[in-house]
């Protein structure tokens, strides 16, 4: 005879579990760049079956951390939420000195006024030249980390980012 389901299983079925997929997460830490005061954000990539990898990053300008995250031009950190991650785009060396060698576009999956967002190197991170931090993107503070992250995204097909506070 076929096995009968319990009443609770029929009334409150549990949703099917999704298989884990490669995902990026961005969270603010309590650390900051000593010379400029830019808060350090932790960008990690979780690829199922592989060790967790973490990278130091900045988002927004040091003096704009509490600005309206949903307003275009606010220079605030990324708004909290989910984003889709685009292709890894190599850039011509020196063409965009404040973006570095690679651009990875990110697109909010929610309504916000923010546009033209991405993940890139912040070559001015920690320098006192008024360019430390980003206009709202995720800026990795180390070039080797940026190149490693780009390779991990390409290899794993990671296409989602979750920004937490």
Q: PLM ranges: what are they?
A:
Residues 4-132, 144-148, 153-159:
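Cell wall/extracellular polymer interaction/catalysis modules
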Residues 140:
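Short, well-ordered, aromatic-rich surface patches in folded extracellular/luminal domains
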Residues 161-165:
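Internal interaction segment
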């Amino acid at each position: 005879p076929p096995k009968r389901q319990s009443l609770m299983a029929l009334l409150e079925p549990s949703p099917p579990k999704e298989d884990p997929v490669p995902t990026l997460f961005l969270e603010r830490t309590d650390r900051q760049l000593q010379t400029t005061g830019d808060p350090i954000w932790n960008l990690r990539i979780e690829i199922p079956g592989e060790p967790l990898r973490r990278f130091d990053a900045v988002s927004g300008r040091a003096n704009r951390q509490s600005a309206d995250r949903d307003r275009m031009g606010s220079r605030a950190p990324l708004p909290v939420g989910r984003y889709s991650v685009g292709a890894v785009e190599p850039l011509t060396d020196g063409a965009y000195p404040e973006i570095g060698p690679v651009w990875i576009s990110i697109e909010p999956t929610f309504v916000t006024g923010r546009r033209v967002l991405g993940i890139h190197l912040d070559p001015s991170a920690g320098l006192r030249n008024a360019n430390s931090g980003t206009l709202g993107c995720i800026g990795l503070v180390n070039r080797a980390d940026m190149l490693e992250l780009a390779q991990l995204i390409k290899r794993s097909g990671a296409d989602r980012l979750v920004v937490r506070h």
